[in-house]
Amino acid sequence: MRNITEATFFVLKGLTDNNELQIILFLLFLAIYIFTLIGNVGLIILVVGDSQLHNPMYCFLSVLSSVDACYSTDITPNMLVGFMSKSKIISFYGCATQMFLAVTFGTTECFLLAAMAYDRYVAIHDPLLYAVSMSPRVYIPLIIASYAGGIVHAIIHTVATFSLSFCRSNEVKHIFCDIPPLLAISCSETYVNELLLFFFVSFIELVTILIVLVSYAFILLSILKMNSSEGRRKVFSTCGAHLTAVSIYYGTILFMYVRPSSNYSLEHDMIVSTFYTIGIPMLNPIIYSLRNKDVKEAMKRVLRKKINIKHRIKKLNDFSVFLMP
């Protein structure tokens, strides 16, 4: 990476300078972060621990949960420290690392959501051949390709952004080191960077949304051919959750990055950015759990196992007390 900038660190201004409001926001985002970790890690443990969820659909879901947990962890802890500290400094390379990880996880999630839509199409269109069509030789490369695409996309923007000069200011009016607010404080010509951002985000969004739309068009045709109302209900329960997640995530990404720079508003975009980087990772486990019968049944099985284990331990303790002289 070619560092020609005069800045050796950046100051993340965050959401507010009001001390009382910062305490409230600290508690709010701490609760959101804890809930995000519990929800996503819990979903991963559930998928790994329940044999009935050992299929490609839930493998994708567990990977999505890991991406969401990492995405939130890349941004939230640093923001929490900023709320409680007078110094909101992040080093030059710390800022570059944060941007690289944020773009990696954000892009990976886009590709994963598209892969999950294709997986749903295969499962519903030809359920008898699902195990063959979506074998580990198919879905594991899809997961690897999603991560690879995210990493390549992140490298392009990280190198392009941090090759700029930041002699104008080192104050970033944002909650983390995102591309648009950094371009806003650069004293270099940013036309190429803006073009790269628009082109790559537009291309990735267009390709992944097209995959989702085509997959769900075929899914809809399959639903119309179904005679069983129970089968339709199950399809809607699994696909409804995914469609909700796709709509929320892709909608916010398009709003943030695919538009003219003249419409860029730091304050407004900071709120939207906070939602898709911190809010969505918290919402995804809720969306996929509440709308998915298999996940809810797996939760019940886990709870029953825990209750049975506790009951057996109690019986053993009672028996040992009985045997004691």
UniProtKB/Swiss-Prot annotation:
GO molecular function: G protein-coupled receptor activity; olfactory receptor activity
GO cellular component, one term: plasma membrane
Primary localization class, coarse: membrane
Record membrane topology: Multi-pass membrane protein
Record's keyword terms, sorted: Cell membrane, Disulfide bond, G-protein coupled receptor, Glycoprotein, Membrane, Olfaction, Receptor, Sensory transduction, Transducer, Transmembrane, Transmembrane helix
InterPro entries referenced in this protein's UniProt entry, alphabetically: GPCR_Rhodpsn, GPCR_Rhodpsn_7TM, Olfact_rcpt
Residues linked to a glycan: 3
Disulfide bonds: 95-187
Keyword Cell membrane attributed: yes
Keyword Membrane: yes
Residues in compartment: Cytoplasmic: 119-139, 216-234, 291-325
Compartments where located: Cell membrane
Extracellular-facing ranges: 1-22, 65-97, 161-194, 256-269
Membrane-spanning ranges: 23-43, 44-64, 98-118, 140-160, 195-215, 235-255, 270-290
One record GO biological process: sensory perception of smell
PANTHER family named in the record: OLFACTORY RECEPTOR
Function: Potential odorant receptor.
Family statement drawn from the similarity comment of this UniProt entry: Belongs to the G-protein coupled receptor 1 family.
Protein name, entry field: Olfactory receptor 5T18
